[in-house]
Amino acid sequence: AVLGPDVEILDLLNIDVVVEATGNPEVGAASALRAIRLGRHVVMVTVEADVTCGWALANEARSQGVIYSLTAGDQPGTIMELLDWAQTCGLKVVAAGRGTKFYPSDADGNPAEAFGRYGYNDELVERRRLNPNMYNSFRDGTKAQIEMCAVSNMTGLPPDVRGMHQPSASLHDIPVLFAPKAKGGLLESEGVVDLANAVSLDGQTLVPNHIETGVWLVVTSEQGLIREDLSFYGLPTDPSGERALLYRPFHLCGVETPVTIAQAALLNTTTGTPQSQPTSEVVAVAKRSLSPGDVLDGSGGKNVRGIIERRSIVAREEWLPLGFAYGSAVNQQVGAGEVIPSAAVPRQTGVLASLRETAGSGHSFSK
């Protein structure tokens, strides 16, 4: 294994698999594209890049005969492992998701305050080299929106509503809440991505028996005996027994990445990869009122946060994907809580924009 600070190291070493983990969408896209064109497999940890152009990178990888995969151990990859298993068993996925610990008071949080909200001291922050913007994206909800967008684009499962429902839920609540409205649940339609919040409705305390760091699926079957088996073997179900919960209570980001590396290098398979065109996008939302000249500071910043929406709606409304909200100054007034229009920032000319345009995403945001 080689840890490199610069993408040029790819030209110098005979590397089979590149793990992209910079956390910056433009840098991540450029690094991954270069690796793919050099014939290297890519394990994409930078989900901020994946949700902006991952389908284009995956298409390029397929054309080059190499693997582009998200990683085992991070929630999107862990969800895909569970989903692949469930579908192989013949189960129908009603909803796929992960846990969160989202306090409404954190929605407009500032990265300068993120470590304090976690209760982290300076020694821990320094020793683990923690990034305040990254940890702020965990607190303001952006990271969960990004990760479920990655799952959406791997599976074709859309969000049921913009930003997802994200109800406060215990493990036993999940198969009850993620059911069609006609059957007492929240969903307009089945086959969606969503979140289960560990924070109670009071916005302060935690729900008992929550799944904050885990991932889950609500599943059903057309076969009555199979539905009965899911309950008989002890899975949490809704009162009717029609829907059951599959879950894994943890994920080990970084620890499990070697699994995906081995899959790519030895088996030429992925943990999960985007479909050829995206199902969803993460759009940039103003955390506060923005005036011309204010600079967008990306995921976990003080000025913007991200929410998931269906790609068809994003393209129609010409909203700005979060991946383009890094370092650009807005040229118009944007109200707090408003989705930022793509016209509010200068022309996009980087690798992200180029990849989207050449992949035919239908909305390149490069003009």
Locations of regions flagged by a protein language model:
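A structured beta-alpha segment of the ubiquitous adenosine-cofactor-binding alpha/beta core
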Residues: A1-V17, T22-E26
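Rossmann-like NAD(P)H-binding beta-loop-alpha module
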Residues: A61, G65, S69-R139
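Alpha-helical scaffold segments in soluble metabolic enzymes
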Residues: V17, R34, A56, E60, ...
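C-terminal catalytic/substrate-binding lobe primarily of soluble NAD(P)-dependent oxidoreductases
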Residues: G116-K367
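Rossmann-fold NAD(P)-binding glycine/threonine-rich loop
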Residues: T22, E26-L38, V45-D74, D84
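Short acidic, glycine/serine/threonine-rich loops at helix termini
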Residues: G54-L57, M80-L83, R98, P104-P111, ...
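Glycine-enriched alpha-helix->loop->beta-strand junction motifs that scaffold or abut catalytic
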Residues: N14-I15, G39-H41
